């Protein structure tokens, strides 16, 4: 399909761990495909290795998506780089775990947003917030970033280090008025799961609080719901399919 200018979309399309419906999640290849498909942004997850490197991967361990085992926090960058990332659809594909610096180097040549989720709710990574902000500043990408986490202490730490950063809360099921909670913390956005949109008054509460809404993970069946809700962004595994629906 021919891609239109992304700035015209009312609801932006962010690629969830890259175009992860087509390439192994959180790999450079997945992010490159998201760029080619015309996404407005990407979402990724960050951990810290034992030698202090910022590593892009969703899980705390490498077991699910690589040919290795173990926790990221216990492995060096060199050990992580030796692993091969694959998917059931591409078991013989040779992909590797990227660092955050490698992904940002790719994204800095675009005008796309980058949503970094700090994965420090199970394994704690002291100093992660400062390392990320330092790297982003060095790459002159501060205007392209938004930070999210289930660990709201981490979001507050980011705000303490730089009050101008954009942040969004991730939250578990059954919260009453998370938008007001986020506003009281000085957070800029809520990042609800797509089914949270069906909670009583949820959408109205977000709008009343004056916050942005970035919804995950919405694929074809749920995209119209997200569009109708007036979300500022949808986070999806299939950016090309999302674009078709959002632009109708």
Feature-to-residue mapping (PLM):
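Phosphate-group recognition and catalysis centered on beta-loop-alpha active-site segments
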Residues: 1-248
């Amino acid at each position: 399909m021919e891609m239109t200018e992304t700035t015209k979309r009312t609801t932006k399309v962010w690629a969830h761990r890259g175009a992860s419906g087509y390439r192994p999640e959180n790999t450079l290849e997945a992010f490159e495909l998201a760029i080619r498909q015309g996404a407005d942004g990407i979402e990724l997850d960050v951990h810290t290795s034992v030698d202090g490197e910022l590593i892009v991967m969703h899980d705390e361990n490498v077991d699910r998506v690589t040919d290795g085992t173990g926790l990221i926090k216990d492995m060096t960058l060199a050990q992580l780089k030796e692993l091969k990332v694959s998917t059931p659809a591409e078991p013989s594909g040779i992909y590797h775990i990227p660092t955050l610096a490698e992904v940002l180097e790719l994204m800095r040549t675009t005008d796309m947003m980058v949503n970094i989720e700090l994965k420090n709710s199970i394994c704690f990574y002291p100093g992660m917030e400062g390392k990320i902000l330092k790297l982003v500043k060095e790459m002159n990408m501060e205007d392209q970033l938004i930070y999210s986490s289930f660990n709201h202490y981490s979001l507050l730490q980011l705000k303490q280090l730089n009050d101008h950063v954009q942040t969004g809360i991730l939250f578990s099921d059954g919260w009453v008025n998370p938008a007001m909670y986020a506003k009281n913390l000085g957070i800029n956005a809520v990042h609800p799961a797509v089914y949270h949109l069906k909670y009583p008054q949820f959408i109205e509460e977000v709008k009343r609080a004056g916050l942005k809404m970035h919804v995950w993970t919405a694929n074809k069946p749920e995209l119209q719901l997200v569009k109708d809700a007036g979300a500022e962004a949808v986070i999806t595994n299939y950016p090309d399919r999302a674009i078709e629906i959002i632009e109708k």
